[in-house]
């Protein structure tokens, strides 16, 4: 059996390899810059030269809209001589490595088998580097390492690090801290003897109350943040704006109900990368192989007597459905109060990526272990082939 150090090191190696591919694109041209960064980060060049973009309405707006934690980090980097655009191209490497480390650790909390941790990080890196989120260096790029850190420390019952990661999450990407808060609440309940029961652990209850109070106070700063750019667009206004129509720039209100609720940008419940366009320009739901593996995990656990690794699954597994329930709940709430809680898809697309990467890694490792039981060590080649294919 290969050591935990080997699989952890291999996870780091793959994260670095993905980073190298990203760097080739990021530094491929003198004027190369990620699309979201072009809007949300360029204004931070003012930290290096305060005379830039004088009276520029859009730059002023993005400066106002950027979370203070992100702006402070970029400002700190500019103070040590790293301008915003250069730092924007470098920070995704660190974000990817931290996400990989915490994903590996979370996976091992659920199934203490190093192979499961490696496969989970491999799936996660595929998801992250094929999207623009991590590479953008914008607030949602910081979501992944911070949310995974929160989950890891929550599973470890490490109170201070967990609370710290929750606070950072609130300052960097507010929508995700609502999902995290929902997870905290759900963990206070358990299903026992066909009844829903509240935990009697006073430590958990106190931690949940304190965490929710801290999050509430931080979110209040966003609620009462003064604005020179008018109020948030209302649902009635959005329905009459062509930009929000199916063919508009935002395309929120899709005419097909199924597409609107599943794969449509901003309104659909699934990540955009799980969907493809058909020849008639209607979006359909597409399941990548690792997503199918994640969906197969409950089936594998139902037949747990046939899988020897199932005995090593810990109670930490419940964190995955808790994340899903919290994400879906806030997705529906966001739809109910459209645009007051930002965009509905923000509450599910990132958490689904994380949950299915971990679930898929655990499921595949259990299947590979079963193959080894059937065919001996020679079938490990088949398992490796499956991983590469996926």
Where are the regions a protein language model picked out?
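N-terminal membrane topogenic signal
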Residues: 1-13, 202-203
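Active-site lumenal/periplasmic loops and adjacent helix-entry segments of GT-C-fold
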Residues: 7-145, 174
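Hydrophobic/aromatic-rich transmembrane helices and adjacent perimembrane loops
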Residues: 340-375
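Signature aromatic-anchored transmembrane alpha helix within multi-pass, membrane-resident enzymes
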Residues: 367-390
């Amino acid at each position: 059996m290969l050591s935990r150090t080997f699989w952890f090191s291999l996870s780091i190696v793959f994260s670095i390899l993905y980073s190298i591919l990203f760097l080739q694109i990021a530094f491929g041209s003198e004027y190369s810059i990620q699309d979201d960064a072009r809007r949300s980060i360029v204004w931070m060049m003012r930290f290096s030269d305060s005379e830039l973009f004088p009276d520029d309405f859009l730059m002023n707006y993005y400066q106002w809209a950027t979370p203070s934690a992100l702006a402070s980090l970029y400002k700190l980097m500019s103070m040590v001589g790293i301008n915003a655009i250069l730092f924007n191209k470098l920070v995704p490497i660190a974000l990817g490595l931290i996400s990989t480390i915490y994903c590996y650790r979370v996976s091992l909390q659920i199934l203490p088998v190093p192979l499961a941790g490696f496969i989970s990080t491999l799936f996660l890196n595929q998801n992250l580097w094929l999207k623009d989120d991590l590479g953008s260096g914008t607030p949602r790029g910081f979501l992944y390492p911070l949310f995974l850190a929160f989950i890891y420390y929550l599973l470890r019952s490490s109170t201070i690090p967990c609370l710290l990661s929750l606070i950072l999450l609130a300052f960097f990407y507010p929508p995700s801290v609502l999902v995290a808060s929902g997870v905290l609440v759900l963990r206070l309940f358990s299903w026992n003897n066909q009844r829903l029961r509240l935990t009697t652990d006073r430590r958990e209850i106190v931690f949940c109350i304190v965490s929710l109070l801290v999050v509430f106070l931080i979110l209040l700063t966003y609620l009462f943040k003064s604005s020179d750019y008018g109020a948030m667009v209302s649902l009635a206004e959005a329905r009459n704006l062509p930009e929000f129509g199916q063919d508009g720039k935002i395309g929120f209100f899709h005419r097909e109900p199924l597409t609107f609720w599943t794969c449509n940008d901003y309104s659909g419940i699934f990540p955009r990368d799980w969907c493809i366009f058909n020849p008639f320009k209607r979006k359909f739901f597409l399941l990548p192989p690792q997503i199918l593996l994640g969906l197969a995990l409950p089936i594998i656990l139902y037949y747990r007597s046939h899988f020897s690794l199932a005995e090593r699954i810990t109670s930490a597994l419940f964190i995955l459905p808790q994340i899903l329930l919290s994400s879906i709940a806030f997705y529906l709430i966001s739809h109910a109060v459209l645009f007051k809680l930002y965009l509905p898809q923000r509450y599910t697309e990132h958490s689904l990526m994380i949950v299915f990467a971990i679930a898929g890694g655990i499921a595949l490792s259990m299947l590979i272990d079963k193959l080894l039981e059937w065919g001996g060590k020679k079938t490990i080649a088949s398992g490796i082939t499956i991983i590469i294919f996926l």
